[in-house]
Amino acid sequence: HAVRATVSDMGPELLSRILSLTPAQEGILHIMFRIADDKGLLLLDLKDLRALLNYVNDHKEDYRMKYGNITTQSVAAILRALLPLEKEGGELFFGEPALDVNDWIRTDAEGRGMVNVLDCVKLVQNPTLYASFLLWLLSELFETMPEVGDLEKPKLVFFFDEAHMLFRDAPAVLVQKIEQTVKLIRSRGIGVFFVTQSPADVPNTVLAQLSNRVQHALRAYTPTELKAVRVAAQAFRENPAFNAEDAIMELGVGEALTSFLGEDGIPAMVQRTKIICPQSLMGAPEAMTRAKAILRDGMEKYDEAEDNVSAYEVLADETQAAEEALALAACAPTAWADISVAMPA
């Protein structure tokens, strides 16, 4: 099934990151979103955004006093930045029906939870889009789910694989947003795990908000790698029974150092733990197995894209009406006033 998000849901900050815009161009994009809100225009897909950019550029003098300077150069740069995004699948990703995270909180007939797998093989080829999607997903969970306090077990747990992509080249304001979301999302009954090769891939401010840690073996030979191991060991609550720094480099296959939040809210001492292997296929499912799972998962509403009335259609109608009005005005007969001339006697 397709996973989609609307342009409005993604917002100007994340969209600016996806498009690699300059601060000046990001400012123009913020103006576009503000104009869309003020005019009641829905930005659902990329053609809506393109239509709005062209429309505002054509009428920029009408908006200059209220919203600030809008330069043709910046608008053109944003339009150019949309081209590679469309080529990389942005036309398919942005649109409706947008993902409703509530659809993931389901149980089967026996009351067991469901595992939802996001196939990001193609999406991950665009690391910036992949990271922005994950961040949007995290924010959507926080904003959508009601506050439920400290539950005995979470309603939903997310495992973000290749988490280093989420933070690579991320501006400070986005890292701060992730930190805030991770800090508060537990009260929504949501658990979040960042899965990555090294703890160093996750900023310290975000690591500080993560209560549960599972650290598999790290191999270190260079001074930089040894420092990373030391930092990883220091993230655990010390256990006098063994040295965590040495243990990380000695762990075998199926072993990990673990530490989880206790009932008193205090992280437990680090333990050397044997991990139970997954009771499933360690690899991609066969095509037939995958097809059967998709057929019975109840997510068929996401299969077909919807093209609802949005900014593209509204602005096209408005432009057509203006052109027809001009054409009528040009074709109307000229009204001549009667002229009386007084002649001398």
Please place each PLM-identified region on the residue numbering.
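Flexible loop/turn segments at secondary-structure boundaries
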Residues: 2, 124-127, 165-168, 200-203, ...
